[in-house]
């Protein structure tokens, strides 16, 4: 057909934008924390450390800085909230597997801590995969999904929309196809 085409995974692009110093900075907690869980309060207390480490951790997970594994495996590099509670068994689990695997595991716990904070304080529908999946899966009708679409866009929706707008402006497509991951 000789139709020029481009493909983009906006889900990955949103995660990479959100999980960056630039993406997390606007979420810097302001005001009181009395209505937050103990876990969220801990993350708030360590927020500056999350901002200092997020870009390097993402680069490590993308394979761009494998030497960071040694630092990540040191107890004082990553800020730690509730996802790190089960670390007693870490040496047993990773003792023979090596530093890279252990660092990837710790970096994943770190991202999951941030994700827990985002779900509690920013966007209850956030998740690393199948964002807002609950809306599509549990619906007997489209009423709940329709109501969700009528709400103001969340911070994460804003990231998605800005990436989409940039792509449309750059590519100027005549036709656009979108895959929607709802069952």
State where each predicted segment sits.
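A short, structured N-terminal alpha-helical element that caps or precedes a catalytic domain
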Residues: 1-183
């Amino acid at each position: 057909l000789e139709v020029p085409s481009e493909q983009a995974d906006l889900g990955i692009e949103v995660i990479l934008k959100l999980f960056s110093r630039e993406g997390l900075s606007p979420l810097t907690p302001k005001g009181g924390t009395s209505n937050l869980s103990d876990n969220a309060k801990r993350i708030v207390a360590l927020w500056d450390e999350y901002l200092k480490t997020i870009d390097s951790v993402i680069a490590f997970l993308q394979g761009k800085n494998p030497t960071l594994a040694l630092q990540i495996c040191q107890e004082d590099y990553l800020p730690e909230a509730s996802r790190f509670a089960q670390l007693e068994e870490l040496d047993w689990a990773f003792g023979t597997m090596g530093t890279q695997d252990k660092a990837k595991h710790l970096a994943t716990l770190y991202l999951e801590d941030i994700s827990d904070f985002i779900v509690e304080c920013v966007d209850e529908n956030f998740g690393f995969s199948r964002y807002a999946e609950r809306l599509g899966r549990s619906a007997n009708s489209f009423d709940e999904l329709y109501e969700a679409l009528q709400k103001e866009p969340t911070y994460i929706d804003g990231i998605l929309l800005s990436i989409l707008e940039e792509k449309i402006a750059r590519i100027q497509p005549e036709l656009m196809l979108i895959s929607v991951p709802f069952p």
